[in-house]
């Protein structure tokens, strides 16, 4: 049977299949490149389109963080799990590419099957929905799911999707309300969560920003559905409960913003800090602007923070580290960090600076146009895990923003 295998025929068939796949999923409708700069962008863009389905469990909708070649998960990056946070960014990229069925399966199937009884999501899962080894939950993952559900609606305008996932979101919101009240009232009932880098426990600005956005998204979900919520139509008790919840979330949004300003802004450094205890500058501080919109990009404190980011975690090559004194794998720059800076600069209308931070990602992509988790500052080549879904998702999100300008 091996002798009868026509390699050239099979190669042509596979090549044709994936070329058709890329063409059909060119959601941004990018035109053919006219120069080497545009060609580089197209190469990474196409690679992203090809990468996402390879990370996705087509049955459950679960999305792993990066390709994992070791089935025992001991010799590689151990990234063959689904982190809700990473997956939410990838889901947004899928929506941009008009792969909306894949996004809907992630939320309507995978997220619903993995939600805990108390409304939260644990740190990470196998793509079949089973709980993976965990060492500490991150509250931003729970908040990000609610944010992501409404984000998906913004692309599809599918009210049935919102109705189908309403109960899931309400359970998550109930958990987040209790978590925030615990912080504000200092009751100590809920254990503080880890940060998005899974390294430090505490009350983190990024986490609070994600919760702010979850409340905002839930208010908008109720606004879209109005009184036309399946199973609750003409139910006065349900309407009263929703009205009360909206008021409560609106007040908690105000309290979160107040807490951040009073506890997570360092007057000496003239900067927001990631945590009240360690007060380090962190690229995730930008999350309060994009995507979570707690602050506008032009607010004085935000501008001061961006200046501090450039002074502390921008390296001599133009790449950005995750945070001050980041020693993980020698504190290399992360494409995610550069792309986050790019998104901020685009939000603030600073196109020249946006191009500078974006170009670093272009010139450090691998020879097959994969984006790594990190960049070696000496060789300017991808370092550690290569083909990181979050990096490629952020790249697509940046391209969408550029296309709208």
Where in the sequence are the language-model features?
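Long, well-ordered core segments of solenoidal/helical folds
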Residues: 50-59, 98-121, 165-187, 238-241, ...
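Acidic/polar, glycine-enriched structural segments that form the non-catalytic walls/loops
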Residues: 1-78, 159-160
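Aromatic-rich carbohydrate-recognition surfaces in CAZymes
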Residues: 14, 79-183, 208, 212, ...
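C-terminal capping/lid segments that line or modulate ligand- or cofactor-binding pockets
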Residues: 79, 90, 125-127, 132-155, ...
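Active-site acid/base region of carbohydrate-active enzymes
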Residues: 30-61, 110, 114-120, 134, ...
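Well-ordered alpha-helical scaffold segments within catalytic/enzyme domains
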Residues: 27-39, 50-54, 80, 88-100, ...
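Extended ligand-binding clefts on enzyme/binding-domain cores
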Residues: 44, 204-210, 232-336
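Acidic/His metal-coordination segments adjacent to aromatic residues that form catalytic metal sites
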Residues: 69-76, 121-137, 182-203, 263-267, ...
């Amino acid at each position: 049977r091996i002798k009868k295998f026509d390699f050239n025929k099979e190669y042509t068939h596979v090549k044709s299949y994936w070329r058709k796949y890329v063409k059909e999923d060119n959601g941004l409708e990018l035109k053919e490149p006219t120069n080497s700069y545009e060609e580089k962008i197209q190469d990474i863009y196409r690679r992203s389109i090809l990468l996402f389905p390879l990370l996705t469990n087509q049955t459950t909708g679960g999305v792993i963080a990066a390709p994992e070649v070791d089935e025992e998960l001991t010799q590689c990056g151990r990234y063959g799990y689904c982190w809700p946070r990473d997956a939410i960014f990838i889901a947004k990229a899928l929506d941009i590419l008009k792969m909306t069925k894949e996004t809907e399966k992630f939320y309507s199937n995978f997220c619903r099957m993995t939600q805990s009884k108390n409304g939260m999501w644990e740190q990470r899962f196998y793509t079949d929905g089973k709980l993976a080894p965990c060492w500490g939950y991150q509250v931003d993952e729970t908040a990000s799911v609610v944010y992501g559900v409404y984000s998906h609606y913004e692309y599809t305008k599918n009210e049935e999707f919102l109705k189908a996932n309403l109960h899931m979101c309400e359970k998550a919101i109930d958990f987040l309300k209790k978590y925030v009240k615990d912080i504000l009232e200092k009751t100590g009932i809920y254990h503080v969560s880890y940060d998005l880098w899974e390294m430090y426990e505490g009350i983190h600005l990024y986490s609070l920003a994600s919760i702010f956005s979850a409340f905002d998204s839930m208010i908008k979900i109720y606004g879209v559905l109005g009184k036309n919520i399946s199973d609750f139509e003409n139910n006065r008790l349900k309407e009263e409960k929703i009205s009360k919840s909206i008021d409560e979330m609106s007040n908690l949004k105000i309290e979160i913003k107040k807490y951040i300003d009073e506890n997570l802004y360092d007057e000496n450094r003239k900067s927001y800090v990631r945590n009240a205890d360690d007060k380090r500058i962190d690229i995730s501080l930008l999350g309060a602007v994009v995507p979570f919109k707690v602050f506008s990009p032009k607010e004085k404190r935000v501008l001061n923070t961006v200046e501090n980011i450039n002074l502390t975690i921008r390296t001599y090559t133009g790449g950005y580290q995750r945070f001050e004194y980041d020693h993980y794998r020698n504190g290399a720059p992360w494409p995610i960090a550069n792309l986050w800076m790019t998104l901020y600069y685009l939000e603030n209308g600073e196109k020249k600076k946006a191009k500078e931070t974006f170009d670093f990602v272009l010139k450090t992509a691998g020879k097959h146009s994969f984006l790594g988790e990190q960049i070696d500052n000496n060789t300017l080549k991808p370092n550690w895990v290569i083909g990181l879904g979050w990096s490629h998702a952020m790249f697509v999100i940046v391209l969408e923003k550029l296309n709208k300008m």
